[in-house]
């Protein structure tokens, strides 16, 4: 590091008006010099640091989403403790970089000497696999999810004091390094239609209202509580700022109010009051939006509210993780919710809640999936509040998940109710929730853990309840059909001791007692 140190010293002497740093993304060790030696720390010549992680107490401490989004979704996380250990201003390095499924409508824009053979290869592969018509939906759904992740990343930075700033790698795609389509704009700087500029400015503007809430999913017997604060990076402090708040669902206004006026100095983490809302008036599963407005500044967040106990009218519905029991019920014309364990899925693909980072081709040590494409108008999801793309209420269902079912070999004509968007380097048809007629029976398959322990989670309970209610009331058989042999192609029995979760035919399906 002697050359950069010498160069910086010369530049600082030649032009002291500017601030200089020798590197970015260096993973500096910031322990006390007596522990590590001064040579391990950033050069004294550096005026500031640009890092995505630093070494503290022998551990790498991350400062962007990958280090935080593997835990229950919340808006309380920050990296203040990391910043407290540094003695120089620090900016986070290239936050975001969430991959969006390539926009194939970009192909005709290449009219010069460069040919987009990567996009052409993806297009041809999708066509071969019968998925080409879904490509625009893959781009839109993965892009909407990426936009939400960018919002969460920026807010994570704004909640961290005294952070000097954050860097986004870019807002447009990088066509190289394995096709790194990580932007809201394509390689030609044209919008993909996945991010609303006004909504993005709410979180990337000069004054940003923020909330700290411990989770995103609530039950209706709880009280929603959040702390309000501001990040003010405008030109001046703000005096007597009054904040209006409201919590609203598609069914109407849940609650509203105003916080006492406060002064907002420059910088981040300035408290502005607290909100408490009893949720007992919410009588059905819903998604609600909390909105804060303070003058021209505005910001909003979604939360999900579900009943504390999902009552299931399971009359005529059999719920089981056992392939043997599912097939036996189907032969009797039963309505079955089959929830296979990871080991039971023969044709499976690892999944993750988060989309792949940068590119599934460049970084191959990740699941590579790119979020969900959801038929949120399907009656199977009538009691499970969801948009048509991944959002925070899916985190607990996908973390962990048995994986997605690869449907390429059974050629179902219908799209899955909940489809996992595969990496563009594979382009498999992946089902998380899908249905088929099996003989005279109606089968819904959900690759999620509905064990007793897992059902402590409100969203898992609600998803199971919604699927069971759909099966109990459905009067139209699925258009697709699977044979018993095709089920064996996709799944396998994994234990003689598999137990049903609920099924009125459970006793009929128990093996006969051994002969004496």
Show where each model-derived region lies:
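Short, solvent-exposed loop/turn segments at secondary-structure junctions
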Residues: 26-28, 96-99, 172-174, 229, ...
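Substrate-binding/catalytic cleft of secreted carbohydrate-active enzymes
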Residues: 1-185
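Aromatic-rich peripheral "rim/lid" segments of glycoside hydrolase catalytic domains that contact
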Residues: 14, 169-234, 495
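Short alpha-beta junction capping motif
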Residues: 315-360, 440-442, 467
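Beta-strand-rich binding/interaction modules
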Residues: 222-262, 272-278, 284-294
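Low-complexity, Pro/Ser/Thr- and charge-rich linker/hinge segments at domain boundaries
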Residues: 304-322, 478, 482
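Short, exposed coil/turn segments at beta-strand boundaries within extracellular/luminal domains
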Residues: 295-300
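Catalytic beta-strand/loop cores that center a nucleophilic Ser/Cys/Thr
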Residues: 66-77, 342-346, 358-458, 475-516
